[in-house]
Amino acid sequence: MKERMRSRMSKQVLTGVVVGAKCDKTIKVMVSRMVSHKMYKKIVKKRKNYVVHDEYNRYKCGDVVQIREHIPISATKRWVVI
């Protein structure tokens, strides 16, 4: 019987700033990116907040962290700190 090789997609890695660290083992990370406006061609800063799993409560507000996609940990957490 032949073994099938599954091709796995690499998980997305983002860099952002911790904006909230009030919950246990959870931080909120804001990721900023620059995009060009389709009509006006102006560079615009877009931001998105991600709820991230922080196993050892290491990070505080203002820290710069890298986060990686993960299987769902809770209803809103789908990212972990690298």
From Swiss-Prot:
It comes from the Bacteria. Signal peptide: none annotated. Keywords: Ribonucleoprotein, Ribosomal protein, RNA-binding, rRNA-binding. InterPro entries: NA-bd_OB-fold, Ribosomal_uS17, Ribosomal_uS17_bact/chlr. GO terms for cellular component: cytosolic small ribosomal subunit. GO terms for biological process: translation. The keyword Kinase does not apply. It holds the Pfam family Ribosomal_S17. The keyword Ribosomal protein applies. Part of the 30S ribosomal subunit. Belongs to the universal ribosomal protein uS17 family. One of the primary rRNA binding proteins, it binds specifically to the 5'-end of 16S ribosomal RNA. This is Small ribosomal subunit protein uS17. It comes from Ehrlichia ruminantium (strain Gardel). The gene is rpsQ.
